[in-house]
């Protein structure tokens, strides 16, 4: 399983709509509103065989109201 975090910058007034669309995606486990340069943070779990770039392009960038994204790939989770 691959874990990625996607920070999203939304059009003005669209963050809640974008968040609603994101949580409908099977791979998205959590969506947070955040402060700073980006509006939302999505935590996604992908199969090891899934191409991360294609996933972000087809499943994230396709949502209306997103202006920019920044994707971080997680290596290990420490608990």
Regions found by a protein language model. Name each.
Residues 1-79:
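A compositional/biophysical signature of low hydrophobicity enriched in polar/charged and small residues
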């Amino acid at each position: 399983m691959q874990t990625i975090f996607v920070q999203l910058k939304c059009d003005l007034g669209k963050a809640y709509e974008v968040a609603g669309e994101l949580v409908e995606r099977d791979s998205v486990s959590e969506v947070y509103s955040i402060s700073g340069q980006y509006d939302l943070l999505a935590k996604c779990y992908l199969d090891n065989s899934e191409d991360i770039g294609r996933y972000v392009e087809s499943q994230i960038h396709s949502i209306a109201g997103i202006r920019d994204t920044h994707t971080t790939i997680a290596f290990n989770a420490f608990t």
